[in-house]
Each structure stands twice: as C-alpha cells, then as structure tokens.
Curated annotation (Swiss-Prot):
This is 3-isopropylmalate dehydrogenase. Its EC number is 1.1.1.85. NAD(+) binds at residues 272-284. InterPro entries: ICDH/IPMDH (IPR050501), IsoCit/isopropylmalate_DH_CS (IPR019818), IsoPropMal-DH-like_dom (IPR024084), LeuB_actb (IPR023698).
Amino acid sequence: MKLAVIAGDGIGTEVTAEALKVLHALRDDVETTDYDLGARRYLRNGELLTDEDLDSLREHDAILLGAIGDPRTVPAGVLERGLLLPLRFKLDHAVNLRPSKLYPGSSSPLANPGDIDFVVVREGTEGLYCGNGGTLRAGTDYEVASEVSQNTYYGVERVVRDAFERAQSRRKKLTWVHKTNVLVNAGSLWQRAIETVGQEYPEVQVDYNHIDAATIYMVTKPQEYDVIVTDNLFGDILTDLAGAVTGGIGLAASGNIDPSRKNPSMFEPVHGSAPDIAGQGIADPCAAILSVALMLRHLGDDANAERIEAAVLAEAGSRDGGPVKTAEVGDRVVANLK
C-alpha cells in the first residue's frame, strides 16, 4: 500500500504518529510518503497546494490527514480555501463519510442515549460550498451578497447510490435529509435521485426528514438512525451534532471518498489542530486510529479494519477517567490487536 501522510499542524502530528503505529503493527507492506502541507508551510513560504503536490498525491492508494490550521497565525479561511477545499474538489472527494457511534467509556450528553450507531453520507463537492456567488456594490448601502447552491443530478446520484450501498450492508434503513418545502428545486432533484436509485434497493427502507426535524430526532432518538444522506451544508451541521451526541469528536473519524476510485480518498480525524495543547502529549489519537480503520475498509481490508475497531473499543472501555498520554493510548490499542 502506498500511503500519503499529511500530518499537518498542532496535534495532527501527534495523533498521526499513533495512527501509523497501529497501522504498521498490522501490516508490513505500507510505504508512506510525508507531505509538508498546512500552516507551517504557508507561514514559511506562502505555499498552500501546488500542482506538483496534487500530481504526487495521485500516485498513492490513500491519504491520511492529521489536522490543518493554526488560528493564532493564519487568518480564517486561508487554509480552507487554499488547501482543504482544493484537495476535496480536485481529487473529486464527492462523499464525506462520518460514522457516529457511542463507544463504551464515552459519555453522551443525552440522559438515555441508547445504542447509537449510524453513518452520515454527506455530499462533498456541490451545494453552497462550490464557490458560486459574489458581492456587488460592496461597502455601500446597496451591497448585494449571494451564495448559490449548485446541485447536479450526476453529483447527487452518485452520493445517493453510495448511501444506498452502505444501508444495504447495514440495517437497511436510509434517511435522506433536506428542506424540500423551501428549497424546492434542489429538493426535487434530490427526491428524484432517491426514488430512482431506490428502485434498485427494494430491501432498504427509505425515510425523509426536514433538516430542522433531523436535528430534533438526532437528540431525542438517535438510535433510530442507520444511514443518513444529505447535501453539503446540512451534512456539515448534522455531523457536528452527531459528534456531540456520541460524546464529542475525540472518537470521530471521517473519510473523503472518490466514489469512482480514480483518485486516492482521504481519511482524517474530525477534530482540529488544537495548537493550545500541541506538544503536551495529551491529545486523544483514537479518531485518527479509527480513520485508519475506515481507510482499510475502503481499500478492501475489512479484517484489519475490524481488528482496529475492536482494539479501540477495548481501549475506550478500559478508561477510568484519569489522564492518559497520547502515545500510551496508541500502545494500548496495539496491545489490544488480535
């Protein structure tokens, strides 16, 4: 396996080291290439993501990302627009995959959370995030600002199909989330894609939630969700809420998937670079480790993915609430591999 590693900034380097420790404990065929991308490189020479970087990344089977950013030194939006979004768009990462599971040892803010285990499939390259908009008469009383949500049938259909495939292999329940009573044009396109693709998956039960209703149900009855599919903006909101109800983002892994598999998909923990605790060795690496499991499953190595998930489950369940070092967590997960 050829793996591109973007450790990034802050605690990204620390959690990535533990994720690689676990990966190398399972497989001896992994060839890694480190990429200096993120705030440090930007501050050093002003570079964000070059064509040469992209060409080199495309030569790999997958990308493992730690965390990007340093809000103390880089203005908001610079790295997002210049690095993270171009990676997503130019590598055609149409599917943003976010598993949400309440692990033993994790504390949900919900009084009676039940058994929470669902996946959010978020469209990743269209909607309001595609950069279609602008400003007229800026700084005047007549200023006009617009953001256009761009949806294509091709883009929606492939994400919907991915979600149906995942539902078929899980509990066979798919919930699509939108705001069709207000966003009638995009909503109609999404509904037709759901109905058309759904004919190929007769065993999958399909439900619909308005986005505002979904935020209520995710708090009041999250255990009823299996696979959720939604657009870019709504997915961004729901996945953060999903992280909260499952005990925080310390265990939240994610994948940015090219469904065509023409480009390497990218896997990363959801948390940020947390520069305030960087270097202290107290960051929880489990989200990065679970991102490796997500990556292996994507690449067809289900057996080792399951071993990692079971090892993290055992480690999380053994915690007593006391402090634990980043490297110690990685060592415990390796020791739990069976």
